[in-house]
């Protein structure tokens, strides 16, 4: 693979002082962000994938890089296997008295907290703020008098109701709650499905920025009050309007050092997940106005706009996607399908060695833990890998997988010393994986490519070189997973109950179509 032909997949910075939305065409769902000095930090939910809760950094709110993860693994053994739609939901990040705090809701376990003084370094192990089922989307807040609070929402799937917000006084060090707290807002009548609250204070008002109306069709609501427990005035401040951006909501208000205000939020586009947008914001009569073309204080999203004024020009940059496995650690674009083990892989001599892990042959591929995955980087693309198969053993199955609600994979299987091609297709909600044989494979090297067209149509190609790739198998339409977009990656398993062999990957490369 010629590295000079590899280009960034999605570039928001237009190089002329403007940016285009989305700033990240990648599934960084439920984003929250802060500014500390001249640095911006953003986090996102990641459900059952590990390492968990990605941390991104930017100097200008447009160009972002993944710099770390908040949790290396999920702190419960049952996440050693995929638990789709569970795990880490919408987190919040805050900076207080020299310490960075991240609150992480796990709807089946409780509200967790991690902290650090160095966001690039190691974060503390998660501890409970409150052990409780069904509480989600927590956000901490420290008032001028030193008292601390946590606002939360609720998951009806766990607790039986939603559309309510709750305030809890907490220890200033976030080590726990001080009392049971109380309900502070009921959105059933005017702000259904209100959730994802983020708490701020300005000019004597407490503000709760919160999405409402549902993930795909919803809007951004802001509540304000002179008392942290309410009563609250309410206002819808951002909606789709005449723009193509559905459900512009759930995110973070951030400012620049010179006082500009901006709002980061997601848009659910289906297969690619919840992608990230940046909107200009200003204040009128102590209400935020987000976006442009505001009517009665409610704006709509911009598609292109002048970049934030941050006092300097920074290089165009994007999160990593393609990987040539040249370092001594996996790139930060990669996550596993569940809690991972270091013995699953090695990086050696410019290759990724995937060691085939024992798997029950009845287990669907979507429920295999050692799938190494990354998020879709654009609406249309190809992804290509080169695998060396010499170290495969009988019972091994290895290849390229595209996960999602409906998933598919193109793999090489070794049985009785002979290798053959196989396509696996299924749906994580059903136990009906189809395994289709595609003929013998008589080479120790295989190039596998998958093309994604119109953010939906997935087609595989194989060859013994990059130049002789031929279509193989069936086109499979993509669908999103449980709260997540589609992810692509590599895997190696053994279905004969024995210690498996290995496959070596030279690269995993994305290219624009």
What is the predicted function of each stretch?
Residues 1-513:
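Carbohydrate-active catalytic/glycan-binding domains of CAZyme proteins
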